[in-house]
Amino acid sequence: MGEFTLNYNGEFGKHRLNALVGYTLQKKTYDRVAVEATGFPDDRIHEVTAHGPNASDIGLYSSDTRKAAWTMMSYLARVNYSFDNRYVVTGTVRTDGSSRFGKENRWGWFPSISLGWTISNEKFYQDLLGNNSSLKLRASWGLSGNNNIGNYEHTATMSQGGYVYGNTVETAYWQGTFKDAAIGWEKTSQYNVGFDLGLFNGRVNLIGNYYNSLSYDLLYDQPISSISGSSSVKTNLKNAKVRNSGVDFQIDGRILTGDFKWNVSANISVNRNKVVDLGGINDLYLVSERNVVSHVTRSGLPIGSFYGYIADGIISEKDYTNIMIDKSNLVNGKFPDGYQLIGPAVPNYNNIHPGDVKWRDVDKNGLITENDREILGNAYPDFTYGISTDFSYKNFDLRATFTGSQGAEVINFQKYYLYNMEGSGNQLASVLNRWHSDENPGSGGVFRAARSSTPNTSQRLSSYMVDDASYFRCANITLGYNFPVKWMQKVSVQALRLYVSVDNLFTLTDYEGYNPEVDYKGNNLLPGFDWGVYPLARTYSIGCLLYTSDA
């Protein structure tokens, strides 16, 4: 990576000017050659080429060769002007060219501007409130770009194979992948307003921000007809827009009393995500594990909203009697005209039994079909928050960090496996309190044990799998001791600190899974899907920091 910049700084009375122009170039290459082989005469030989004279005895197991490169070129400029430490204006502009896009839309233009007003430096403020507090107002707008795609999404490749022509097989070439040569930058326009407030000579500070961003020209794998040779093409959804808006606040405080010092910081954030427009295309239905449709992206809703059937409790033995009466009147999968349903709706496949999950018949036709699927929730929390604190008394210090989330939901797809009760694997402890009979219904939240029908009825993706993922977590706590300086000077040591630390000490949550913070293969269109990834580890550390004196 290379960066070349030219700076200018000037001060003229109450005016200050800072300017920068620059050029950056970065390139990343990936070159891999991997070979596996068997048949070496000695386990201590680690080189494939070190086979000795009997090369024919070595069996090449597999080989893999990959090579890729990515380049970004940027031109940038920034001007910052301030007057009398009260008013600040900053303008920036940059243009970026990415090799990940085709020549038609390779370059993106990204300007921004920000304004600041330090009200506490105004005479009227100081006359009214004095010098014990500070207040600054901020506002900004900027345009940013996203090129987070593969390296060659704009370049089609050719495939080769045999083609029978007459009595001979000829070599044939065809377009193996379909690409959009005009693919370009995804862009986000964002407005921000905020304030910085300091009280009691800086002992208490409050920061507040409001933001509103609109992303457009969204990068997306657009499904296409397989006749093209590909199932999808990476492209920009030209008229699609997604909005994120929210507020965040942070308060910092410090207490200094003799040998006792205490710093504490707390923050809270609220974000709302909404698909404004999908650019005229239909709803995006996304498939996750076991080829199950679990999410939908739809105009007016958050990205990747949960989608499935609505569970309405557990079917009782009385319900089952009514179902059998109803089912005997089915004609070609439909009820006769004027027929009044007595029991729960009948699924469109497989029989149901007492103890199975009862599904809501959304369209009121007496049958449970794909048309009965509804929006079940989403993975976005009502708010997130964090607390960090730092105590010190003489040479001892205690630091702790806490994080939390309230109102988020998760599709706990582990229930598909951990509630199957087929004897093929471990189960959640809550299955001990499952439904057995109307006289012993258990907790009312776990369906019956079954061997074959359960996966086809009770384990379809539904609100039954949607769990509250709110949590409060101690992310880290550290206790330390700093040895007195006068002791260390005697052994030519500048400073010595011993500490013990624990990461992920505890998590308070009602979520049954390993971790309420989940991610499905990094796919932003499938948020909040828990398929049983490795749990978050708890780490214990003991260490020391030693600073030696200069010679």
Where are each of the predicted segments found?
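Surface-exposed loop/turn segments flanking beta-strands in extracellular/periplasmic regions
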Residues: 1, 31-62, 153-178, 227-234, ...
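Conserved small-residue
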Residues: 34-36, 41, 256-377, 503
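Outer-membrane beta-barrel transmembrane domain signature of Gram-negative proteins
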Residues: 1-86, 141, 178, 373-375, ...
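Conserved small/polar residues in nucleotide/adenosyl-binding loops
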Residues: 547-551
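Outer-membrane beta-barrel signature, preferentially recognizing the C-terminal barrel domain
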Residues: 53-74, 164-205, 234-257, 300-307, ...
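Extracytoplasmic gating/loop element in the C-terminal half of outer-membrane beta-barrel translocons
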Residues: 98, 351-354, 405-503, 519
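Transmembrane beta-strands of outer-membrane beta-barrel pores
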Residues: 23-29, 64, 93-99, 119-121, ...
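Surface-exposed extracellular loop regions of Gram-negative outer-membrane beta-barrel proteins
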Residues: 1-12, 16, 70-102, 106-121, ...
